[in-house]
Amino acid sequence: AEKIKICLQKQVNSSFSLHNGFGGNLYATEEKRMFELVKPKAGASVLNQSTWICFGDSRTDQSNSAFPRSADVSAKTAEKFRSLSGGSLMLSMFGPPGKVDYLYQGCGKHKVFYEGVNWSPHTAIDCYRKNWTDIKLNFQKSIYELASQSHCMSLVNALDKTIPLQATKGVAKNCNNSFLKNPALYTQEVKPLDQICGEENLAFFTLPTQFGTYECKLHLVASCYFIYDSKEVYNKRGCGNYFQVIYDSSGKVVGGLDNRVSPYTGNSGDTPTMQCDMLQLKPGRYSVRSSPRFLLMPERSYCFDMKEKGLVTAVQSIWGKGRKSDYAVDQACLSTPGCMLIQKQKPYIGEADDHHGDQEMRELLSGLDYEARCISQSGWVNETSPFTEEYLLPPKFGRCPLAAKEESIPKIPDGLLIPTSGTDTTVTKPKSRIFGIDDLIIGLFFVAIVEAGIGGYLLGSRKESGGGVTKESAEKGFEKIGNDIQILRSSTNIAIEKLNDRISHDEQAIRDLTLEIENARSEALLGELGIIRALLVGNISIGLQESLWELASEITNRAGDLAVEVSPGCWIIDNNICDQSCQNFIFKFNETAPVPTIPPLDTKIDLQSDPFYWGSSLGLAITTPISLAALVISGIAICRTK
């Protein structure tokens, strides 16, 4: 009788790279980084398509006769906008004669504002003020601030009021022989000579708790008054000083100007200038007292429900060639904590006309069609990687990547994976210790193809018991890592959240500190990923060793009395009793056996966070169960000895 020895061979060459892990090591033909660096896309996007709203003008107005050529957004995004050609939030607040008056209102956790150009130097609105840019800046800033704290907002275009009987609505030559809708100008008709100076005015207005279906917890009110250079300019008849003051229901002064206690400007001029301060007032009844002759009466407001903190994006709104713009929107957003500003890099060049349908702006706003994982001043990201090459400028919200160098990201094995020998006392021993970990004294198991034929055998753990790391223990390990990481980061997250509210007060110092914190977080995350990588490698290695044990057990079971196991992975067969077809059945599974499969290794890691926290992440979680790695066996190397 001729007896031969058939073994699973140990083979590996210099093309393999070694990967060390907790509980076991691997050789692999390939390797890949756990994550690739992502690059943010410039422009605006949103975290959730169902929770955002926009306010715009003709560039987002679907009813415009030139739509879609006039639009800077897609038709899908235009449906989200509350827009009317020629409109702006400030025009609706003040209501200059002859201008579009649109009822802006809507609800959303994330609010995008792309409007403002229709009140700019080009429109040349006067009404006792040649340059409205400062008022526009304060108005837009107040809108952004309150919008970031509210779910819903609405223009209130008719406040309840009580006006003195002797006062009637007045007009002004420098306001198209009309006047603003808000504030309204009321004047006294003075007849008796002894009353030539007139009487003081007392009026009342009420800020509602609700306007239509919109709840109002806070109102933005324009407190407007005149500024005179001197008392003589105000009243050449020698009457008293000018004043216009707003009081709340308790008699406290909340706005206005009183030249009885405040000096005049002292400049030379004979025409007053109207000033409007932006007040944030609670619902209630307010009184307005003014010096004789006339009264500026608040008749509109913007109301906010103040129900939740949200996101605000402001888009630069400028004219194209030949028209003068201001940059109040830009300045207002930059001076409002948490406001993200979208700015053009080139002049506005329209498609429909010089001022509508700019290609660069369309690209910057194209992200509004999608959901992003992170939005920031640097742009938006929808990839899952936790790392980016450059630091993302705040404000930023969502699951934002941290800055890292590519070479610092850990690598994991890929391709053909071979477990090494080693000892891990935490691993449950298989029932039969064929290819047990402690038995793998030298070399690596590598099953190579000797002769073509079979479809292959996919190795991996197909049992919930036996050797190797169990699914339950692996999941518990990853859960513990996630909890530890959250504890590690919690104090940092709280600190950064507080810094977000202070960013505008000491901007550079805060930004520098924030950058240091984010760098530390990036280094910590890289270290955490290194631990996870080592656990993955060990988990895969142990699982593959168990799979080899399963393969050896399968061979022994198939052989029965025809083959005698003489050492781990080696059998003696009588060639005269078990011919080639017999050996093929034992070792090649007769070339017809179905190929068992298991899920491939999934190393996807997801960084979870509060979607409106402007830092990065609050914790780390494995999004899907970790499967043991798969090793494809194309055949069995046969080492014959007589």
UniProtKB/Swiss-Prot annotation:
Post-translational modification: In natural infection, inactive HEF is matured into HEF1 and HEF2 outside the cell by one or more trypsin-like, arginine-specific endoprotease.
Gene Ontology CC: host cell plasma membrane; membrane; viral envelope; virion membrane
UniProt GO BP: fusion of virus membrane with host endosome membrane; fusion of virus membrane with host plasma membrane; symbiont entry into host cell; virion attachment to host cell
Keyword Transmembrane helix: yes
Signal peptide boundaries: 1
Hydrolase listed as a keyword: yes
Purpose of the protein: Binds to the N-acetyl-9-O-acetylneuraminic acid residues on the cell surface, bringing about the attachment of the virus particle to the cell. Plays a major role in the determination of host range restriction and virulence. Class I viral fusion protein. Responsible for penetration of the virus into the cell cytoplasm by mediating the fusion of the membrane of the endocytosed virus particle with the endosomal membrane. Low pH in endosomes induce an irreversible conformational change in HEF2, releasing the fusion hydrophobic peptide. Several trimers are required to form a competent fusion pore.
Protein name: Hemagglutinin-esterase-fusion glycoprotein
